[in-house]
Amino acid sequence: VPSELHFAVVVPEVMVSTEYARSVLPNHVPFKEAVQNVSHASLFVTSLITHQLSNLSVALDDNLHVPYRKTLIPHCDKVFDAAKAAGAYGATISGSGSTLIAYVDKAHVQDVADAMGAVFTANGIDNRTYCLEADTTGASII
């Protein structure tokens, strides 16, 4: 993971059970959407390897779970839009939700986290935000 890539995370006080989040997913998806997601996953890895982080805006465009699970998270699209407007390459749902994560350069990570949290706050939803970076050392003895 490139050292310049950071993560703005917002955890809204919205309960999304993994079991329910799985239940909203379709049993089948169109072949075209599946192929598109595979190409985006490949672009995601390539973007990290080549440090071409601007490609993450396309690579993070998911058709397999985000369109369905975002309906479980109030104002999800507004949070994604706020993240991008504040400088994020893109944003997505972390796991089954309700945590949202934006991929952003170090210089903009706090602005993006603040913008994401502000959407929930403005709509009366308590939340916590975090500015994170990847641990590239892996497992180690402390």
Tell me the role of every PLM-derived stretch.
Residues 48-142:
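Glycine-rich, charge-dense phosphate/pyrophosphate-binding loop(s)
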Residues 8-71:
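Active-site rim beta-loop-alpha module in soluble metabolic enzymes
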